[in-house]
Amino acid sequence: VPLVIAFRLIGAALVVPVMEELFWRSFLLGYLINPDFKKVALGEFAWFSFVAVIVMFALEHHRFIQAIFAGIIYTTLVIHQKGLRGCIIAHATTNLGLGLYVISHQEWIFW
């Protein structure tokens, strides 16, 4: 069981942030501005895509309100930094912190 937990934590902290940010903020944020998303600069701002990506991101997570706040932070980082590095690091830090909390407090409901 400890090995399974270790793999879960590694996945949550390293794999999930990269994959989710590539989808939500690299692809979908641009796609909602222009379906030919490759023509949209990373971090380009439009209210509709900003709000839509945050809401859809939150709907995909267990804790909607908390995910709204996380989505606002991650999306704002992409827009201000014009890149994914900051939001991937923030997302990884969030997931690592949550994972360590879940393990140390045995609060498996958060996973």
Enumerate the language-model features and the residues they cover.
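Transmembrane helix-loop-helix hairpins at the membrane interface
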Residues: V1-W111
